[in-house]
């Protein structure tokens, strides 16, 4: 799939079925994560898979996620950056996107979760690590609503179809809005 189509059809899953990952699927996820860490270089990055979603959720609820709204999922993958080099974080983020693509092929949904404001000790308790810093967290699980994952893409509408001046009979042009 080319980048344009990837961006058009990629979805984020915020609601997951309340069931643990099947053992065979969990093994495949571990292999995907392990392969990506190997490819990117373990000296700078680690991907931590935690299939005890309940414990991660309890540890991070109220402090992680957009404005502290944590996404509840059966599993989480954390990007553990082993240094503060911005290139490491960028490389890791690309690695997470590769992982997301492979997880979607397994029928799993994913959602990025903000952890930048979470205290390091809290993150260490959630993922049991001692080296580096978790910069990115990914919720992983079976989507609650498969239909939403298969949504159809609609091209961006023209300004004239969405914005009006004074009344609904007077569409605004791009020039009007400048």
Regions found by a protein language model. Give the residues of each.
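Acidic, surface-exposed loops and disordered segments
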Residues: 1-178
């Amino acid at each position: 799939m080319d980048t344009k189509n990837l961006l058009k059809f990629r979805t984020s899953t915020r609601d997951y079925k309340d069931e643990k990952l099947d053992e065979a699927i969990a093994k495949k996820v571990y292999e995907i994560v392990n392969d990506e860490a190997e490819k990117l270089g373990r000296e700078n990055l680690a991907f931590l898979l935690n299939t005890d979603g309940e414990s991660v959720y309890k540890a991070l609820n109220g402090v992680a996620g957009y404005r502290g709204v944590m996404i509840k999922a059966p599993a989480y993958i954390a990007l553990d950056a082993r240094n503060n080099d911005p290139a490491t974080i960028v490389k890791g983020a690309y690695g997470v996107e590769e992982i997301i693509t492979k997880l979607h092929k397994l029928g799993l949904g994913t959602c990025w979760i903000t952890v930048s404001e979470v205290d390091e000790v809290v993150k260490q308790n959630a993922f049991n690590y001692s080296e580096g810093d978790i910069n990115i967290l990914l919720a992983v699980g079976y989507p609650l609503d498969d239909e939403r994952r298969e949504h159809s893409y609609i091209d961006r509408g023209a300004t004239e179809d969405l914005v009006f001046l004074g009344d609904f009979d007077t569409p605004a042009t791009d020039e009007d809005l400048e």
